């Protein structure tokens, strides 16, 4: 029974995505909504991304320094581990989980509200492909902004580590710099960016799907937002496992 329901939901998701990409609206109309969605979904998330990443980078640096204190351990190991954690997991995977809660609920509730207030029905009556008009700009906006947010997150985390060096004196800036530069593999950076594209697509499409299929009133919109966050978060975790194995 559960498997049947999952397959039915997945089939409805594929049908909706087919509508989204089958007949896009005019480029001028799409461009205006695309810019608006980039601001709403990406630009408005920059502050929270920078703040969380800054403090996480600082905490990682402190914890590594305090818990791996040994005469046999190089002094720069805190900088090295901080860089690897920020590049490989936190800035791409964990940050996208956080954004799934903020952005995913925003997308689902906005589209769900449009559904229950019959705005989507009005678009259909006017002959507009409502799925493409409402959802496609959000998908493209997320695909544009999430990789940039991942880069901002990594940078902010490194700055947070330097804050512990200059202000907290946990580690010297010279040792931190040595660790950050030690054995740097550019592919790790690109791996995080590549994963973020997949996560952005998952968050945008899954959240839009739950919002678009809302039936009922405001209670249904709230449930759709919750389902969107839970489902997109789980899919981000599953895809993170698969992509890490594939790209490593």
What are these regions (language model features)?
Residues 63-87, 154-197, 201, 205-224, ...:
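Membrane-interfacial helix-loop-helix connectors in multipass membrane proteins
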Residues 42, 46, 50, 90, ...:
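Selective transmembrane-helix segments that form parts of the transport pathway or gating/packing helices
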Residues 97-115:
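A hydrophobic alpha-helix feature that marks transmembrane segments and, especially
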């Amino acid at each position: 029974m559960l498997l049947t329901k999952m397959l039915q939901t997945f089939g409805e998701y594929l049908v909706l995505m087919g509508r989204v990409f089958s007949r896009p609206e005019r480029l001028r109309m799409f461009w205006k909504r695309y810019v608006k969605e980039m601001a709403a979904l990406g630009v408005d998330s920059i502050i929270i991304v920078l703040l969380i990443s800054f403090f996480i980078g600082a905490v990682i640096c402190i914890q590594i320094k305090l818990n791996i204190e040994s005469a046999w351990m190089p002094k720069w190991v805190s900088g090295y581990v901080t860089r690897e954690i920020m590049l490989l997991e936190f800035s791409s995977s964990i940050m996208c989980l956080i954004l799934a809660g903020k952005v995913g609920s925003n997308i689902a509730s906005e589209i769900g509200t449009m559904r229950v207030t019959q705005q989507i029905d009005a678009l259909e009556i006017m002959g507009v492909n409502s799925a493409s008009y409402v959802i496609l700009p959000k998908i493209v906006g997320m695909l544009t902004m999430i990789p940039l947010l991942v880069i901002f997150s990594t940078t902010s985390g490194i700055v947070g580590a330097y804050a512990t060096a200059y202000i907290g004196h946990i580690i010297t800036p010279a040792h931190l710099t040595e660790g950050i530069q030690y054995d740097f593999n550019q592919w790790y950076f690109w791996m995080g960016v590549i994963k973020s594209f997949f996560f952005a697509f998952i968050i945008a499409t899954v959240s839009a799907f739950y919002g678009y299929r809302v039936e009922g009133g405001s209670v249904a919109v709230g449930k759709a937002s919750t389902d969107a966050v839970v489902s997109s978060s789980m899919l981000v975790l599953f895809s993170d496992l698969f992509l890490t194995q594939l790209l490593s």
